[in-house]
């Protein structure tokens, strides 16, 4: 396990970098006000749909209690008056000014009363759910019948529910709009297409992946084959109501998928076992990825971006308005993410646009403070794409966007752009609205923005395991190979004296970790993995927890320390990134999602414990 002394060193190094960061944020522009929001009036209608809300509780006053459990390093602190926060005040002004923005249409009272007796699919006998009335129309899903010996209750699945209008044609590179109502009954029994994406190659001729990583990706890819720009759908996994006694209001867990900002989907992650065991509603969703989801589609400071995050906000808005029809509690919504999904959740925690849409957060192996969480040079990425598509580099925003909309999405995905190691090509950016400022500034200076969220966060022990290829993981590294890779990382991470950061880090880690009984090549490899795991994931997550624990005592940290014994990493002494997901979704209790299917009795009990911890947090914080 990573030593505290080494972890503190990385935290200090990261803090120094934050102090001396030379990144010029959007807030320094005269075209944005002192709160980081655009002054241009033409942008206001575009964001109105996200700042408008049917009720007054989108930006509620925060009442915090200092009572409750806390970690050893947590401190009590008074919370600033929520109404005095400038970010929230400006967002509230927009919300009130545009309260007449289009909202999802309500269905008639006659439709709301239409409830059909449970039927069966005539093709295979699969039982249907009861009909559910949401604002857009009537939905019918199917029941997943659990094996009687499992001890699990049945789960109603509603798959492929549109939470926003399809972002095609003139809607491409635009914020999501409300979903279009439908007439009659909509069968919610099939997963939707995934959003357009460039999938990782399984060509392992150069041993790009370890055997374990290769097998993981191979299991995941079949879920991602059918894609379309019409992809803004979510899936609900709801404990079946047996009709006996009053129906319970279930807490809600919304899962934001990880792996990458450029590929993957919520579809592979079947929430049935987690929903049944924990008696919660589990929601998975798709959001726009890569260029279509995160590229800034223009060179003007006023260009709207972060469409992937706006999609997530739109999904949370749909959940808030409709989850009650499924027996869910709109006041008990937890958003959970892993990897890049965890960074997205953290961004939503500091976004005034997402206020009031969820109440608790679970961060797994990621943070908004991680060096990979933001695209640091979005304009460079945009210029490369425009050049590759022969779109005007110096045109007005409308001209550039029109050119991008004329292209087939396959052309857009096919553009070749530079992808240096340790950098993010197309991910969230500081836009002054969804992400109002650099996350460390928002969490440090405007902590009341995210103080209302309870937080559970944690990591595995080898978060950077997949950085190395199979050869390096098997045979280790030479000292100069380790140092060259670390030197390149430090140069990308620190603008001031990266050589000093490298020297101090190596001195600290080699002093702690040098093992005379281990081969030098293995030692150098393990040094590298420990340093990068701490610097890129562990230290940023601990810092996020420190920020929040100062204003909210319900802040809990865990370390996941188990690899499946029959899985890809069973021989390793430390847990590998992503190994926790199978236990959170209950894979040892039954076949769900893209996980291996060989678990022993002890691991089934362990999965039950993990699900209990996570769902208890969703229920009570």
Where are these regions (language model features)?
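Non-catalytic accessory segments of hydrolases
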Residues: 2-3, 14-110, 117-309, 330, ...
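Serine-hydrolase-like catalytic core of hydrolytic proteins
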Residues: 7-22, 221-397, 401, 406, ...
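A structural signal for well-ordered alpha-helical segments within the folded catalytic domains
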Residues: 156, 229-232, 310-313, 317, ...
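Surface-exposed beta-strand-to-loop junctions
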Residues: 211-213, 296, 359-364, 521-523, ...
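Residue-level preference for long, well-ordered alpha-helices that form the structural scaffold
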Residues: 301-304, 308, 371-374, 378, ...
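Hydrophobic pocket-lining residues that define ligand/cofactor binding sites across diverse proteins
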Residues: 323, 548, 618
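Short, well-ordered loop/turn and helix-capping segments at boundaries between secondary-structure elements
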Residues: 351-355, 550, 587-590, 620
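Substrate-gating cap/lid region and adjacent catalytic-acid/histidine neighborhood
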Residues: 406, 410-601, 613
């Amino acid at each position: 396990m990573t030593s505290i002394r080494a972890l503190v060193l990385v935290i200090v190094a990261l803090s120094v970098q934050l102090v001396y960061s030379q990144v010029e944020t959007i807030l320094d522009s005269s075209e944005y006000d002192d709160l980081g929001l655009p002054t241009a009036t033409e942008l206001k209608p575009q964001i109105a749909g996200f700042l408008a809300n049917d009720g007054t509780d989108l930006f509620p006053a925060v009442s915090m209690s200092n009572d409750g459990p806390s970690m050893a390093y947590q401190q009590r602190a008074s919370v600033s008056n929520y109404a005095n926060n400038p970010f929230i005040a400006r967002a509230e002004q927009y919300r009130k000014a545009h309260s007449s923005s289009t909202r999802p249409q309500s269905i008639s009272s006659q439709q709301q009363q239409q409830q059909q007796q449970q039927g069966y699919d005539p093709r295979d006998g699969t039982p249907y759910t009861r009909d559910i009335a949401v604002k857009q129309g009537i939905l019918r899903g199917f029941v997943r019948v659990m094996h009687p010996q499992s001890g699990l209750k049945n789960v109603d699945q509603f798959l492929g529910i549109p939470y926003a209008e399809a972002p095609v044609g003139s809607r491409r590179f635009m914020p999501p709009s409300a979903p279009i109502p439908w007439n009659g009954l909509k069968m919610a029994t099939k997963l939707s297409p995934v959003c357009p994406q460039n999938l990782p190659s399984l060509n392992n001729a150069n041993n790009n992946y370890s055997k374990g990583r290769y097998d993981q990706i191979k299991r995941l890819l079949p879920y991602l084959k059918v894609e379309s720009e019409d992809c803004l759908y979510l899936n609900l996994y709801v404990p079946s109501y047996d009709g006996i006694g009053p129906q319970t209001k279930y807490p809600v867990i919304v899962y934001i998928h990880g792996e990458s900002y450029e590929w993957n989907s919520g579809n592979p992650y079947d929430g049935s076992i987690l929903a049944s065991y924990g008696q919660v509603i589990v929601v998975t969703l798709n959001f726009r990825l890569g260029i279509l989801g995160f590229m800034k589609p223009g060179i003007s400071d006023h260009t709207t971006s972060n469409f992937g995050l706006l999609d997530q906000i739109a999904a949370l808005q749909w959940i808030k308005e409709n989850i009650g029809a499924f027996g869910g509690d709109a006041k008990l919504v937890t958003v959970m993410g892993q990897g890049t999904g965890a960074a997205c959740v953290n961004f939503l925690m500091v976004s005034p646009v997402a206020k009031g849409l969820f109440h608790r957060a679970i961060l797994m192996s990621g943070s908004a403070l991680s060096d990979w969480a933001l695209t640091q040079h979005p304009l460079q990425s945009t210029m490369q794409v425009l050049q590759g598509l022969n779109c005007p580099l110096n045109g007005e925003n409308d001209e550039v966007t029109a050119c991008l909309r004329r292209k087939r999405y396959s052309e857009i995905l096919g553009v070749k752009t530079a992808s240096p190691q340790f950098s993010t090509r197309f991910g969230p950016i500081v836009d002054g609205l969804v992400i109002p400022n650099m996350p460390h500034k928002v969490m440090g200076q405007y902590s009341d923005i995210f103080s209302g969220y309870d937080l559970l966060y944690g990591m595995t022990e080898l978060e950077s395991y997949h950085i190395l290829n199979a050869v390096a993981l098997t045979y280790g590294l030479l000292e100069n190979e380790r140092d060259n890779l670390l030197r390149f990382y430090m140069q990308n991470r620190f603008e001031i004296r990266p050589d000093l950061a490298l020297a101090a880090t190596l001195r600290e880690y080699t002093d702690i970790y040098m093992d005379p009984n281990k081969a030098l090549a293995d030692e150098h490899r393990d040094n590298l993995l420990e340093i990068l795991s701490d610097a890129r994931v562990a230290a940023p997550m601990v810092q996020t927890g420190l920020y929040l624990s100062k204003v909210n005592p319900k802040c809990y940290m865990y370390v996941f320390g188990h690899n499946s014994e029959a899985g890809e990493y069973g021989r390793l002494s430390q847990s590998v990134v992503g190994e926790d997901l199978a236990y959170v979704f209950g894979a040892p209790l039954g076949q769900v999602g893209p996980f291996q299917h060989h678990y022993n009795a002890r691991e089934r009990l362990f999965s039950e414990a993990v699900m209990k911890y996570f769902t208890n947090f969703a229920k009570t914080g």
